[in-house]
Amino acid sequence: MNKTLSVMLAAGLLVCGMAGAAEKPAAAFTPEQEARIGEIAKDYLLAHPEVLVEVSQKLQAQQQEKQQQAMTAAVIQNQAALLNDKGTPSYGPADAKVTVVEFFDYQCIYCARLAPELEKVIKASPDVRFVFKEFPIFGQRWPASLSAAKTGLQIWKQKGADAYLNYHNAIYATGHNEGKLTDADISAAAKAVKFDAKTAHDVQGTLDGINTLAQQLGFSGTPALVVLPSAGASADNVTVIPGYTSAEALQQAISHAAGDTKK
């Protein structure tokens, strides 16, 4: 990058010196001067293509940082919807110091890969609350995605936290994602927790609310995770993870939200 700037500055100084010889300094480069500067820059970039890679990486990092800041600000603004929706399944103590919120789709392959990692964290963190935002983004493409999400919410309302988590884990344990999940898979997982479909609640309103919340947070894909203090969330203690992560990284985010470590 320094070499590029040197070339451009040299070109600029050259034409500025030419312009300085005139009676009045030029307000801008002439077409001929602009063409020459362009040729110099083009020749340099052709000889040093790694500069373009460096610039691209820097721009991408800047865009990701801006996106992260925007999502964090949205999380802080929408804390109540993230933490207090009684229609959303949760597991763990209601008075937990830290909450982990997951937006997921049962047919998402990266959600499936995240599931065992999250299960490890749940087992290792009995003092943390976990909130499960059913976000079936593949529902139109694969109907079982929506069906599994609705059944999960209905089990939560009818049977509570333990039954919901068992169902949730059982769906992922099938290993059936990306269109492979079947109605039989869903029925078997629901039957295992003694779910009564005849007395099921209407959960469309909850799904609509989750979809709206995801849009407000800037989440367009799954999985997406938010780790935050259950009270007093700020830009300094919130972690937003828009994608797959490991159990270790998730534990670090939990410690950060609890104030135990620096981010």
Predicted segments with their positions:
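Sec/Tat-exported extracytoplasmic proteins
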Residues: A41-L45, P49, S56-L59, Q63, ...
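N-terminal targeting signals for export/organelle localization
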Residues: N2-L5, L14-N78
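Structural alpha/beta surface segment adjacent to cysteine/selenocysteine redox centers
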Residues: A112-K191, Q215-S220
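C-terminal cap of thioredoxin/glutaredoxin-like
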Residues: T4-L5, A22-G38, K42, S187-K263
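Short active-site neighborhood of thiol/selenol oxidoreductases, capturing the structured segment around
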Residues: Y91-C108, A115-L118, F130, E134
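Active-site-proximal beta-strand/loop segments in catalytic clefts of secreted hydrolases
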Residues: F103-D105, K133-P136, I171-Y172, L228, ...
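Long amphipathic N-terminal alpha/beta scaffold segment
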Residues: Q64-T99
